[in-house]
A protein has these predicted regions:
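Catalytic-core regions of glycoside hydrolase
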Residues: 1-114
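Catalytic domains of carbohydrate-active enzymes that cleave complex glycans
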Residues: 1-25, 114-277
Length: 277
C-alpha cells in the first residue's frame, strides 16, 4: 500500500499510511510506511527509547500508540482500575507519544470472535439474552471481544482468542434495535465512565502543558511521582526473553491522588494566586 501511495502521481501521493507494528523492526520491515502504531505491555527500555526517538526525530514519520496493556499503561477494559484511562495520557505525555489510537468505540457486534462465541445459557440460564448471533447485549454481557470458548475452574469464563471485557466499547447504544428490551430510547450514544476518565486524563495533560511553561522542573516532578514508570520504562525481567516482567503498574489507583496532582498543577499555573483545594 505504501508503495502504491508513493507512486501515485496525483493527490493520492500525499496520503499517509498507517500500520500497527513494533518500532523495533520498523526500519527493516516497514521502510515506507510513515505512521506506526504499537501496543505495548513490556519492553526493553534502551531499545524502545532508541527506536521511538528515531521515529520522533524523522519529519516524514509519526509514532502512535494504540489500545493499552498493563503494566505499560492503563487499559480500556471494564475490569481495570477506574483510574486506568486517566493515567494513560500522563504516560503518553511522559514518553513523548504524539497520538493515541484506540480501536474501537462501538464494537457491539463481535464478528472477530469467530465461531467460538458460546450460547451463554451454558453459564447462566438467562444467558440467551446476552447475545444474538455475534451481536452482544452490552447491557448484559461484560465480555465484548474475542472468543468465548469455555469456563475455566480457576479464572472463570474465558476464551483462547483475546477474551476481554469492554474492549472495543467506549459508548453504549441509546436506542437498541437488536435487543429492544434494553433500549433506553435515547437518540444517540451513551458515553461510558471509561471515556469520561480518559477525557479527564487528557484535561490533566493540558494543565501539565500550561504548568511546564511556568515551572518545568516542578511539573516534571509531579509527573514522575504520579507515573514513575510508563510504556517501555517498565523494562523486562529477562533481556534474553523480553516478553514479561514481574512488576505491577507503577501508578496510584487512588483517585484522590490524581485530583491532588491536578490541584498541584493548577497552583503552579496560578503562581502567587495559588489557592487551597
Amino acid at each position: 500500500m505504501s508503495r502504491f501511495v508513493a507512486e501515485n502521481p496525483g493527490p493520492g501521493g500525499d496520503l499517509d499510511t498507517f500500520i500497527t507494528a513494533s518500532p523495533l523492526e520498523y526500519d527493516t520491515d516497514l521502510p515506507s510506511t510513515n505512521i506506526l502504531g504499537t501496543v505495548i505491555s513490556v519492553g526493553q527500555t534502551a531499545r524502545w527509547e532508541e527506536a521511538t526517538a528515531a521515529l520522533n526525530a524523522d519529519p516524514d514519520r509519526r509514532y502512535f500508540m494504540y489500545n493499552g496493556r498493563r503494566p505499560a499503561s492503563g487499559t480500556f477494559a471494564t475490569d481495570d482500575d477506574g483510574v486506568a484511562l486517566r493515567e494513560l495520557p500522563w504516560g503518553q505525555f511522559k514518553t513523548g507519544i504524539s497520538r493515541w489510537y484506540y480501536w474501537n468505540s462501538n464494537y457491539w457486534n463481535n464478528f472477530l470472535g469467530g465461531p467460538a462465541v458460546r450460547d451463554l445459557t451454558q453459564v447462566d440460564p438467562q444467558g440467551a439474552s446476552y447475545r444474538l448471533g455475534t451481536h452482544t447485549n452490552v447491557f448484559k454481557s461484560a465480555h465484548t471481544f474475542g472468543s468465548h470458548d469455555f469456563f475455566d475452574p480457576i479464572i472463570g469464563e474465558t476464551g483462547v482468542f483475546n477474551y476481554s471485557n469492554g474492549d472495543g466499547v467506549l459508548m453504549y447504544p441509546g436506542t437498541d434495535r437488536v435487543f429492544p428490551a434494553e433500549s433506553r430510547g435515547i437518540d444517540g450514544p451513551i458515553a461510558s465512565l471509561r471515556m469520561k476518565h480518559w477525557r479527564r486524563g487528557i484535561q490533566d495533560v493540558k494543565y501539565i502543558e500550561l504548568a511546564m511553561q511556568v515551572n518545568a522542573a516542578a511539573t516534571q516532578a509531579i509527573i514522575n511521582s504520579m507515573v514513575p514508570k510508563a510504556m517501555w520504562e517498565i523494562g523486562v525481567a529477562d533481556e534474553n526473553d523480553p516478553t514479561f516482567v514481574h512488576e505491577p503498574p507503577s501508578w496510584s489507583t487512588d483517585p484522590d491522588d490524581w485530583e491532588a496532582a491536578r490541584a498541584q498543577l493548577i497552583n503552579i499555573i496560578l503562581g502567587s494566586n495559588a489557592v487551597a483545594f
